From Swiss-Prot:
Residues 1-22 form the signal peptide. Residues 29-40 have a biased composition (Acidic residues). One of its GO terms (cellular component) is extracellular region. Belongs to the frog skin active peptide (FSAP) family. Plasticin subfamily. Residues 23-44 form a propeptide. Highly expressed by the skin glands, and intestine and weakly expressed in brain. GO terms for biological process: defense response to bacterium; innate immune response; killing of cells of another organism. It is found in: Secreted; Target cell membrane. Its main location: secreted. Residues 25-44 are annotated as: Disordered. This is Plasticin-B1. The native peptide is a cationic amphipathic alpha-helical antimicrobial peptide with potent activity against both Gram-positive and Gram-negative bacteria. It has weak activity against fungi and shows low hemolytic activity. Acts in a synergistic effect in combination with Phylloseptin-B1 or Dermaseptin-B2 at doses that are not active alone. In membrane-mimetic environment, it adopts well-defined helices that lie parallel to the micelle surface. A short amidated analog (AA 45-67), shows potent activity against Gram-positive, Gram-negative bacteria, and fungi. InterPro entries: Frog_antimicrobial_propeptide (IPR004275), FSAP (IPR016322). It comes from Phyllomedusa bicolor.
Length: 70
């Protein structure tokens, strides 16, 4: 009986160790994906603000060249 009990504990232990390792890897991958998403959102916001700024600058230049008439 004691032998079966020890064997059962060993099997459960050997099953739980890989399970916990998989959980750690999964959480690391999710964190990496979240960081990549955050970085892409920052880049998108930067590009949008640059385009808006360039549009305002060009609009001001064309407005002053044409004498403010469209």
């Amino acid at each position: 009986m004691a032998f079966l009990k020890k064997s059962l504990f060993l099997v459960l232990f050997l099953a739980l160790v890989p399970l916990s390792i998989c959980e750690e890897k999964k959480s690391e991958e999710e964190n990496e994906e979240k960081q990549e998403d955050d970085q892409s959102e920052e880049k998108r916001g930067l590009v949008t603000s640059l385009i808006k700024g360039a549009g305002k600058l060009l609009g001001g230049l064309f407005g002053s060249v044409t004498g403010g008439q469209s």
